[in-house]
Amino acid sequence: MGAFVNTKVYIENKNIRDWLSEALSMFMYMSLLLGSAATGHFSGREDDALFGVIFQGFSITFGIYIGGAMSGAIINPALTLAVALLGKISWRKCIVLQSAQYIGSFIASAVVYLIYNDSLDAFGAGANFTATEPGVFRKDVAGIWSTFPKTYLKERGAIFNQIFCSMLLTFGFLAISDYKNFRPSKGLFPIAVGLLVMTVFLAFSYSTGAAMNPARDFSPRLWSLIIGYGIEVFSYNQYEWFWIPWLMPYVGAMLGALIYQLLIGAQWSKGQKGESKHKDP
């Protein structure tokens, strides 16, 4: 049976295989992440920092395990851009993976909503919910899908937070995926990335939610708009928020890639040269 399926279903086009692998990896990651966020909200643990750290780390770990050997399972458009800038993947693959990441995240948002539809209705946050009820933005519910800052946080503080978190994430990701560095074994790589995400999230998520991943924030935000949560999910703080967790991780990832390459990647002696995990064949 397995041989028959392998023969009949095998897809010759590498780009399609990578897209499907990355989309499924992202779907796994976001399903676990959003499902955990919903559980935290319904159980009154949305402000439990340790709970948030644990589901952030384990969600991305199992997402990487799904398609890591096929597409690389970077499952983060900002990190995907960073590794493309360093020449570790082609620009074509960068576009393929990024599209899969956004779409996989969007589909996961829809599935989690359907699974928790009855619970959302019971908590007054179902299909007829609007984010302003009455006239007060319900960040607690909208925050199931995407991140929102503390009310006191100024725009410049939010921008710096997102850039810095993404930069740290990129430092760590490039280091543990670099054969020339103290890279973990293949089977432990997803765990190392999960621990990295947990550490950065625990250190810097309090004021912004530390999305660090454009597809993690934008796709669920778009879904929450589509299901009727109101334009407030985008217009919050006079449209001065939604673009920060969407675009600033790209800036942080590019800075992180540049700094890592200048200070570490370009400084290996000739005898230490190797190949990156994400180098295209």
Curated annotation (Swiss-Prot):
A motif (NPA 2) lies at residues 213-215. Its main location: membrane. GO terms for cellular component: plasma membrane. GO terms for biological process: amine transport; polyol transmembrane transport; purine nucleobase transport; pyrimidine nucleobase transport. It is a multi-pass membrane protein. It catalyses: H2O(in) = H2O(out). InterPro entries: Aquaporin-like (IPR023271), MIP (IPR000425), MIP/Aquaporin (IPR050363). A motif (NPA 1) lies at residues 76-78. Keywords: Cell membrane, Glycoprotein, Membrane, Repeat, Stress response, Transmembrane, Transmembrane helix, Transport. Residues 72-84, 208-222 dip into the membrane without crossing it. Induction: Expressed in early embryonic state, adult active, and adult anhydrobiotic state. Transcript abundance is low but expression is slightly up-regulated in the inactive stage (during anhydrobiois). Belongs to the MIP/aquaporin (TC 1.A.8) family. Aquaporins contain two tandem repeats each containing three membrane-spanning domains and a pore-forming loop with the signature motif Asn-Pro-Ala (NPA). This is Aquaporin-9. It comes from Milnesium tardigradum (Water bear).
